[in-house]
From Swiss-Prot:
Record-level GO BP terms: translation
Complex formation: Part of the 30S ribosomal subunit.
Protein name: Small ribosomal subunit protein uS7c
Keyword flag RNA-binding: yes
Originating species: Huperzia lucidula (Shining clubmoss)
Family from the record: Belongs to the universal ribosomal protein uS7 family.
Gene3D superfamilies: Ribosomal protein S7 domain
Subcellular location: Plastid, Chloroplast
A single GO cellular-component term on record: chloroplast
Length: 150
C-alpha cells in the first residue's frame, strides 16, 4: 500500500504543486512562513507579468524537469557516471529543488522576490535552474556509452 501520492492541495490555489513547493521551502517547521514566502512570490509574478502565477509556476517546473539523471556505478574497481531515465514525479521533485536552490543563490533582498524572478526566468527558458538541467543532460549525453551498465 503506497502512501507516496498523498500530497494535499494548498488552501489558496488548491494545487498540489504549490504544496510541494511550500514543503521544500519549509525550514525549522515554519510552514506559515513558507506559505507567506510563496504567496508573496506569486503576487510578484502576477504584478510583473499580468499572467496567472499558477500558469507561470507550471511552465517553469515543466521547463526545468530533467528527463535523465546521472548515477555513479562502481564496476570492477572503476567508477562510471551512468545516465538513467527518471520518472516524472522524481523529475518534478528535482526541478523544484533546483528552482529553490537557484533562487536562494540569486542576488536580491528577500526570498520571495528572488524566487519569483527565478520562476519567471525558468518559464522563459533561462536562469540558473535551466542551466542546471542542461548541464545534467549534457553530462548524460557525454556518458551515454555507459548506459548499458544500468
Amino acid at each position: 500500500m503506497s502512501r507516496r501520492d498523498d500530497t494535499k492541495a494548498d488552501p489558496i490555489y488548491r494545487n498540489r504543486l504549490v504544496n510541494m513547493l511550500v514543503n521544500r521551502i519549509l525550514k525549522h517547521g515554519k510552514k506559515s512562513l513558507a506559505y507567506r514566502i510563496l504567496y508573496n512570490a506569486m503576487m510578484n509574478i502576477r504584478r510583473e507579468t499580468k499572467y496567472n502565477p499558477l500558469f507561470i509556476l507550471r511552465q517553469a517546473i515543466r521547463q526545468v524537469t530533467p528527463n535523465v539523471t546521472i548515477e555513479t556505478r562502481r564496476v570492477g574497481g572503476s567508477t562510471y557516471r551512468v545516465p538513467t531515465e527518471i520518472e516524472s514525479t522524481q523529475g518534478k521533485a528535482l526541478a523544484i529543488r533546483w528552482l529553490l536552490e537557484a533562487s536562494r543563490k540569486r542576488p536580491g533582498r528577500n526570498i520571495a522576490s528572488k524566487s519569483s524572478s527565478e520562476l519567471m526566468d525558468a518559464a522563459e527558458n533561462s536562469g540558473n535552474a535551466i542551466r542546471k538541467r542542461e548541464e545534467t543532460h549534457r553530462m548524460a549525453e557525454a556518458n551515454r556509452a555507459f548506459a548499458h551498465l544500468r
